[in-house]
Amino acid sequence: MVRQQAAAEAIEEDRRFPKLSLGLHLDLGEWSYRDGEWRQVYEMVPADDMVAVEAEILRQIELFRQLAGRDPTHLDSHQHVHNQQPMRAVFAKVARNLGLPLRNFNPSVSFCGEFYGRGKGNPFPEGISVENLCRIIRSLPAGITELGCHPGLDAGLDSDYCAERSEEVQTLCHSRVRAELDRERVTLVSFAELPLAG
């Protein structure tokens, strides 16, 4: 999210690990679920104005380029707005024009969301355990699967999914997980290595 305070620091950290993917998490606004209903926290551009949406996407890509000195390896969006029409078509057009993968757009890539520390909004620590991740690895289908995860180490993050992020880091880096990947002959790849969707 290039408009966030820590963007420059995150990109600087990325330079230490050049093999990692560095995607652009496009931010068009945020909604929060409170007291049984969704409420808008902020909006970058009107969600029903596709010309404004495209212009904002391009602005954020340009800001990413200025900060990183290169294109992102892939695109996605905050709160998955790129999965919903009519925005999906705009995101797809921009990604296609730039030759960048767009998350959840390539039919040859399946998605696994089972590695998550919440279940129906409540804490679910078993979801981010070493045992669960090893089970997921054993049950992966042939082909390419994206594992949805939210690892992080910022204890001061303003999020209701904060402690779980450091647990995810510990689990993802655990030696038993590495051994399971090797045993199941799973090769980790970055978004930069994925085929583009037509």
Q: Each PLM stretch: what is its role?
A:
Residues 2-21, 27, 32-68, 74, ...:
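Terminal accessory/targeting
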Residues 79:
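Active-site histidine-anchored catalytic micro-motif
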